[in-house]
């Protein structure tokens, strides 16, 4: 079958940084698992070419902000490899609606009509789910298959190789990754999750977007333009 790394299309800086990770047996097992699931007729999201979209869209040497999600969306046509983001033409999910509400409150940014966050990724916002695949209609179905180990390594690589990155950890799952981050050189921002179940327990009002830009500017870095284009 060949090595996993040889079969993965991945942006060059990440491929170099994660070379050793792709060589580990658990990544071969994960690859085999995904192939078996597809062979059994199961629908896996996002499509194969978009599994590593977060890394492809935001090269390692350009990472300024990391937002940590959990699972890809498990409905048809939603997931495209960026956490919280949906494909063009798909209704904006509730958690992302609350993210937009906080952006409006924090930076007076008009709430967009779509939920396609590619523009953020292209500016250096790594939109990283901790599991990179999911079975249709089955939330969390791939969480124990090795992805968390892989994405933990992604977080460690950013922490070790980059300077002055803002990590936004929303909810207990994301905050469990705090141990992977060197807070002496990075800014770690924690709050409740933007889900409708918890957004009003500390997500709305957290000011994370303005605080991120202040931190970037303090270190001579261009802030993120959180506006999204009218048309994705």
Swiss-Prot record:
Keywords, in A-Z order: Cytoplasm, DNA damage, DNA repair, Hydrolase
Enzyme class: hydrolase
Family annotation (CDD domains): UDG-F1-like
BP-aspect Gene Ontology terms: base-excision repair, AP site formation via deaminated base removal
Keyword rRNA processing: no
Cross-referenced NCBIfam families: PRK05254.1-1, PRK05254.1-2, PRK05254.1-4, PRK05254.1-5, ung
Subcellular location: Cytoplasm
Protein name per its UniProtKB record: Uracil-DNA glycosylase
Organism: Azotobacter vinelandii (strain DJ / ATCC BAA-1303)
Entries under InterPro entries matching the protein: UDG_fam1, Ura-DNA_Glyclase_AS, Uracil-DNA_glycosylase-like, Uracil-DNA_glycosylase-like_sf
Residue numbers annotated as active site: 71 (proton acceptor)
Main location: cytoplasm
Job of this protein: Excises uracil residues from the DNA which can arise as a result of misincorporation of dUMP residues by DNA polymerase or due to deamination of cytosine.
Entry EC number(s): 3.2.2.27
Catalytic activity line of the entry: Hydrolyzes single-stranded DNA or mismatched double-stranded DNA and polynucleotides, releasing free uracil
Family designation: Belongs to the uracil-DNA glycosylase (UDG) superfamily. UNG family.
GO cellular component terms given for this protein: cytoplasm
Biological classification of the source: Bacteria, Pseudomonadati, Pseudomonadota, Gammaproteobacteria, Pseudomonadales
One term of GO molecular function: uracil DNA N-glycosylase activity
């Amino acid at each position: 079958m060949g090595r996993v790394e040889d079969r993965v299309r991945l942006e060059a800086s990440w491929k170099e940084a994660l070379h050793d990770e792709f060589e580990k047996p658990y990544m071969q097992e994960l690859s085999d698992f995904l192939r078996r699931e597809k062979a059994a007729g199961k629908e896996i999201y996002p499509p194969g070419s978009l599994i590593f979209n977060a890394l492809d869209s935001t090269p390692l040497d350009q990472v300024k902000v990391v937002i940590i999600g959990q699972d890809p969306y498990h409905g048809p046509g939603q997931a495209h490899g960026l956490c919280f983001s949906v494909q063009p033409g798909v209704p904006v999910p509730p958690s992302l609606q609350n993210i937009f509400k906080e952006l409006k409150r924090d930076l007076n940014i008009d709430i967009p009509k779509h939920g396609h966050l590619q523009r953020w990724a292209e500016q250096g916002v790594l939109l990283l789910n901790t599991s990179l695949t999911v079975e249709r209609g089955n939330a969390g179905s791939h969480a124990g298959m090795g992805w968390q180990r892989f994405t933990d390594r992604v977080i460690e690589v950013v922490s070790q190789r980059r300077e002055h990155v803002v990590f936004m950890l929303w909810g207990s799952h994301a905050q469990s990754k705090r141990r992977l981050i060197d807070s002496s050189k990075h800014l770690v921002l924690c709050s409740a999750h933007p889900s409708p179940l918890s957004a009003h327990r500390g997500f709305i009002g957290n000011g994370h977007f303005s605080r991120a830009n202040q931190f970037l500017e303090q270190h001579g870095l261009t802030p993120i333009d959180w506006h999204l284009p009218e048309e994705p």
